[in-house]
């Protein structure tokens, strides 16, 4: 089997997640985060229009946003989903653990992805 190393240069993979935060590119970030082509932004849960504003502003660089709602899956409010979809951004809601894994896979595939991650 041939192994190929994947380079995520210039991207922001989630190295790990744990109690109260995330390790992004080797640095611990406490709290809930928005990861986008424009960088890392913190926010206070729950996910609201203010947390999603940086994504809408970058809609031309994002095809899909993964929303990690914490330890359990919780629906995203319809007006928030509609605002993202109106901006041309697809939305997938899942647990934070699933969102972290899926985000990293999509980054490795060089997809135009962002993530909203509620800390667990």
List PLM regions with ranges.
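A short, acidic, amphipathic alpha-helical segment used as a generic capping/interface helix at domain edges
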Residues: 48-59
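Non-catalytic interface/targeting segments
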Residues: 1-49, 108-120
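Mid-chain, well-packed structural core segment of small domains
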Residues: 59-94
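Short active-site-adjacent helix-start/loop capping segments
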Residues: 42-44, 73-76, 101-102
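C-terminal structural segments of small proteins and small subunits
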Residues: 86, 90-118
């Amino acid at each position: 089997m041939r192994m190929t190393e994947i380079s995520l240069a210039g991207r922001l993979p989630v190295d790990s997640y744990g109690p109260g935060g995330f390790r992004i590119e080797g640095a611990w970030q406490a709290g809930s985060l928005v990861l986008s082509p424009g960088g890392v932004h913190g926010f206070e849960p729950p996910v609201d229009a203010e947390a999603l504003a940086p994504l809408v502003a970058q809609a031309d660089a994002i095809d899909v946003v993964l929303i990690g709602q914490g330890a359990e899956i919780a629906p995203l409010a319809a007006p928030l989903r509609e605002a993202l979809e109106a901006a041309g951004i697809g939305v997938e809601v899942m647990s934070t653990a699933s969102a972290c894994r899926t985000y990293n896979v999509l980054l490795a595939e060089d997809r135009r992805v962002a993530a909203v991650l509620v800390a667990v």
